[in-house]
């Protein structure tokens, strides 16, 4: 068996050697001989790619500058250029530049096989001899052979001719002329008179009569001297000042022009037509007075592949079947809760619904084909634009509300009061700390004396009383509890320090453990209500007295939304005190009776359960869950027609609903969209006072200030007197904030406001005329001349015409307005406006001032609340 295997292997090796020697390769059903494997040479040659057909190598090297220039470019480590001039004798010739670039090439030498050529020449000679010996034909053929044909036949390889190729060397780098040739400027000579220098040198047939004379340049003038037999004036030769380079660009720029992939070729016009719209289409919008869209938009191309997008579309279809009109915020909330994506809703929603731009369903998405202007039951889906001020908002944020400007006047007073209260609390805490530290020192001294006596007794009676340590521990526990009851009002840090001092004094381990347990039960602790909550607050709860203390950085206890936790949490002070013995453990992993097993992430709740925040101001009536307000909107009568502003409700019922919401939740924005056009005169002149928050609590009659008012000057106009009284009254009211009481808001308040506003309009016109007349009097009065006024026209004032020369140097002085005389001007103005004089109308003005003061005081009281 071994002999047979050895024979087979030897046969296989012989066949392989034969195949290698005369192996054929099949490529496209054509057999080729295998190439012989040969080693690479070690020599290195450098190449020069000449950009022309080289017939004479010597001239080609001279045009480059010689071998020295080539070797310098190859040997240089820096980037150098090799200049190539196609016309080296012409000074105006612009060179092209070549650079050295690394390559990995092989230099081949290809030669024809000499043995084969010799055999072919012998056969050709024999054939020619046979032709010579053969008889000549009767018809002579024309001579077709010539030198050119013979040369071509010699140059062209024969069919059966073979060549030998050998690798001579490696080419590691070559010089290439990849750059562009510069613009070539050729000087043209004048055929009549002038010629170039090269032409003059080579021209042997020039006439002897005319001689060329060089140009002579003088200082003042430049001209050509004439020296010829014909006395012809010779022309100036051109300067021919050529720049060294015409073009700054050496290498061409590869623009890579490509056809637009979105373009389509039109055979009729034979042009490329581009897509008109490459981006996503906009969503469908509709106005209240326009026709609603019915046709859906096309779904994106990814819809057929993306399953999540299909799922979100199915969710949206189910939501629009339940409810045909949705706000975008509430729609996103529902989609997210059911497992959809927000990014997909934006792309899929235009294929199912359209958006209302204005009207009672502003910023709502309505199902395609559904017209809410026809169906009266869509009144419950109408939107309400509702905001509250920052002071009434239970969830403060950094974004400003629209009516912040109305409350800027009294913010400083509220902040100052809060600072004063915090300072008082800090002082009280410091005093309590000092007192308690003194008491602790006294207690420590007494404890040390008692302990020293007890230790001596225990050392004597260790063998007799084995249970003495336990009794001692119980006594220490009782003493520490009493000390903790004394310091209930201390902060956490004070309690910890006291306990540490007592633990250091007691040297036994059992006492330390008992002390730590007592500390947990008796000392106040910090609890954090809802980690991650936006209104996160720290509450310090005392375990003994049941009092709740607020971190001074947080001034209010905020209610926690119940939807953020699985169980309701105590928010009031009474509920916190009831559970004081066992602190609230609301964090994940807590323990205890009131502990929360797990924390549920807060989810956006779009319903109108509590006062709206400043972030969202649009709500649908169906989302209002306040029972009193929901019952009102359900009981409102619906009109027969749908209006643009109030929808299916009347103006009175809509405004009444807003007033109810205002009384329940806060202040309505003064820049709301729904304003009546009937009271245009009052709406334009209303000040910020009328839009301030009004509380619904009953008010008691106001206590007037006891300070006397300053007497009004007789001759001073009313405008300035009223302003002065207002400032004085405001100062008195600010000093006596405690004297401001509450008053009722009756239904007659609206009528009184309109009357007051009309009075303000009349007085504003009156004050404007008085101010203008006073300005005129200041500039036109004389020094001692009386005032003259005519309402219908005429003299308004006059100058003091004194002829005294001494008065010329005096400065211009204004006359006194009224020197205790009767006020003629005020009487005439009162007669013109149909009012009383200044003295007779003091009582009416004082009453009006008191009414304005009452409004201002009410506003300040409400802000303080």
From Swiss-Prot:
Source species of the chain: Dictyostelium discoideum (Social amoeba)
Purpose: Involved in RNA polymerase III-mediated transcription. Integral, tightly associated component of the DNA-binding TFIIIC2 subcomplex that directly binds tRNA and virus-associated RNA promoters.
Basic and acidic residues: compositionally biased ranges: 412-439, 448-489, 697-713, 757-766, 773-786
Family: Belongs to the TFIIIC subunit 5 family.
Region ranges (Disordered): 1-21, 111-163, 191-215, 391-522, 669-865
Gene name in the database record: gtf3c5
Record text on subunit structure and interactions: Part of the TFIIIC complex.
Protein name: General transcription factor 3C polypeptide 5
Lineage of the organism: Eukaryota, Amoebozoa, Evosea, Eumycetozoa, Dictyostelia
InterPro entries noted in UniProt: TF_IIIC_su-5_HTH (IPR019136), TF_IIIC_Tfc1/Sfc1 (IPR040454), Tfc1/Sfc1_N (IPR041499), TFIIIC_tauA_Sfc1 (IPR042536)
GO molecular function, one term: DNA binding
Keywords: DNA-binding, Nucleus, Transcription
Coiled-coil segments on the chain, per record: none
An annotated GO cellular component: nucleus
Biased composition (Low complexity): 7-21, 115-126, 140-158, 199-210, 401-411, 508-521, 677-696
Record GO biological process: transcription initiation at RNA polymerase III promoter
Biased composition (Acidic residues): 800-820, 839-865
Localization per Swiss-Prot or TrEMBL: Nucleus
Top-level taxonomic group: Eukaryota
Pfam hit, one: Tau95_N
